[in-house]
Amino acid sequence: MTLTPEASKSVAQPPTQAPLTQEEAIASLGRYGYGWADSDVAGANAQRGLSEAVVRDISAKKNEPDWMLQSRLKALRIFDRKPIPKWGSNLDGIDFDNIKYFVRSTEKQAASWDDLPEDIRNTYDRLGIPEAEKQRLVAGVAAQYESEVVYHQIREDLEAQGVIFLDTDTGLREHPDIFKEYFGTVIPAGDNKFSALNTAVWSGGSFIYVPPGVHVDIPLQAYFRINTENMGQFERTLIIADEGSYVHYVEGCLPAGELITTADGDLRPIESIRVGDFVTGHDGRPHRVTAVQVRDLDGELFTFTPMSPANAFSVTAEHPLLAIPRDEVRVMRKERNGWKAEVNSTKLRSAEPRWIAAKDVAEGDFLIYPKPKPIPHRTVLPLEFARLAGYYLAEGHACLTNGCESLIFSFHSDEFEYVEDVRQACKSLYEKSGSVLIEEHKHSARVTVYTKAGYAAMRDNVGIGSSNKKLSDLLMRQDETFLRELVDAYVNGDGNVTRRNGAVWKRVHTTSRLWAFQLQSILARLGHYATVELRRPGGPGVIMGRNVVRKDIYQVQWTEGGRGPKQARDCGDYFAVPIKKRAVREAHEPVYNLDVENPDSYLAYGFAVHNCTAPIYKSDSLHSAVVEIIVKPHARVRYTTIQNWSNNVYNLVTKRARAEAGATMEWIDGNIGSKVTMKYPAVWMTGEHAKGEVLSVAFAGEDQHQDTGAKMLHLAPNTSSNIVSKSVARGGGRTSYRGLVQVNKGAHGSRSSVKCDALLVDTVSRSDTYPYVDIREDDVTMGHEATVSKVSENQLFYLMSRGLTEDEAMAMVVRGFVEPIAKELPMEYALELNRLIELQMEGAVG
């Protein structure tokens, strides 16, 4: 989903945030940010359990040739015979009888995103996948949902050169000879229990053939998603790079304005929000943005105007809003005279708000306006500064004349009490009370204070120019006593106060949109719901003979005490605010969405909306893929994986390539998330001068085990291999490097280098290294290095002494740690990998 863009000529800078405590940082590590589940009609009807009948049914549904059926049945018998491996992670939690081995999500593969069923299309829109194709960042795209590829496309110029990029099922149908020649030759069914399982029940995946001499310079890309609970995904990828060709295949399991409330109370257009910025969630607290998505909308936009007209915002139909339906809290009295049904205030205050799709939210329903709960700033300012800032917002300006700085405050000549208040504050803060100029014919009293420090303080914390004024992060994070003092001074200078029915009504006007909404946010902290109304200028005007340019004026109004308006109800941590108007329009424009750390929400004009996020179920799912690659003489293949499965997935993958004479095979592997990952990309170097390389990084959080590594078999002379493995563990997580380098007899002149580096964030995590080196030839160069380390306090001290915060210092250390892998990725994926690890590590001190 998403929000429509707000045009903005200038973008405010991201707010400065206090570093997370170690406990907060560690609690946030390893959090999986894509845990929504779509409707699951197909999965609900799928058969559980594995048997010969299930295997025959899969083959029949795909109308496969008999040789493939026989291959599947043979593999099933091997799977039944082989025991669960005990040498690695604990796999006892896998219940093979409870898994759904085939779920068909759509009857027909789509050639365009628009042809996909709406629920599946929305999923990939949320993940931002079509955008990469639109921007020509990839040469071809495949998207697998459940058991089958639902979308497939390849660039026409590559197709004309003979490049084949199909889903594996279509590859079997359309190119049976090539398929049969290579299928199972690199990874036979008998290799291990899970390769046997995959061979028996495989479905989906990618089939790629690159003709001799053809170079595919832009990556081919595939996305895999499990939506169904207890689903097993068993894609089979087969890549053949013919002689002298090159291809880069990228596989990913993670994704790629309205005014959004940032953590300092500022409002910024959604398109200006960046990864790493802090926004306010529906709990009122600051949370990090972990991803920004954009797509083109061709559909309905819903605009909601709450009780506060300037807070109106627009969202797409499916975007969840935090709301309370009026029908659930209304009294039994009938609606009359155009008024909505009255509500029972007790029911409303005790009702539990819930996430409801925008299209299902009606006029009269209640939206949730959370009360901000910012992190208190470590610098506590005196109340005199609060009063001075309040008067400056209302009546002050900072003046720089001939290099001389001053603060000037303009009051009515009758407001001498406020004049003295300003002078006393300046005297206390800057030891200067300034001068007062009374001009009776203008009914004015002007205070001028020459102060360099005061000028800088107001400039930096409140701003210069009436329409540009807003409070800094430092001021917004002061306590309620400070803010109440500031608001009272502001009302003294620029407000109107009346009393009706025992309530005090307060109203102020400002030309600064940002200050108007900051004030609304501050008042919510103080227990008052304020409305904001925009008044457009009527055109140029003349005041006392001078032409003036009129600007938009924002009126902010609220009540204190007595029997004020009760349409918005104070519900403790939030206000329940009624929707006054709901409108729908057809839109053809870009829309944006943010992924935000738990609680997965942000505020649009102060109101709670949900970020769109891959499903997390209480029971486990199984991902058991097989990737076979044949690299012909002098060809080169690079295979990049960035996986971010939810922490209920067993991720058990067999990946192996055969590199022939002069060929190069490169595996770039990033593993984040999952319950258990067991993955060891391998290269069998069967021809002279073949090269194999594995660069991998793994992150293990609480209750996660990343058992990863590599296998290199030197089967011919003058072959070379390189393994670089990086791992990070925290919160009791475990990482393991498990590797094999084998140099067979006759593979003289071979060279191999292995480097394993592990980083432990805390004292409860674990890292293991299980290297196995088998050298059967004399003329061999072999190097192995393994390190386990914590983030050094000396490193942090050195960086912080250069002006970095603890957060920034930690982030720099982590970036350097993963840099050997990140630099090998395409730019978008390097940023994504760095983002995932860097944000998770931020604030955690080893």
From Swiss-Prot:
Entry comment on modification after translation: This protein undergoes a protein self splicing that involves a post-translational excision of the intervening region (intein) followed by peptide ligation.
Keywords for the protein's UniProt record, in alphabetical order: Autocatalytic cleavage, Endonuclease, Hydrolase, Intron homing, Nuclease, Protein splicing
CDD domains: Hint
Pfam families for the chain: SUFBD_core, SufBD_N
Region listing for Disordered, in residue ranges: 1-20
Superkingdom of this protein's organism: Bacteria
Domain DOD-type homing endonuclease intervals: 388-528
EC numbers for this chain: 3.1.-.-
GO molecular function, one term: endonuclease activity
PANTHER family to which the protein is assigned, alphabetical: FES CLUSTER ASSEMBLY PROTEIN SUF (PTHR30508), UPF0051 PROTEIN ABCI8, CHLOROPLASTIC-RELATED (PTHR30508:SF1)
Family note: Belongs to the iron-sulfur cluster assembly SufBD family.
Entry protein name: Iron-sulfur cluster assembly SufBD family protein Rv1461
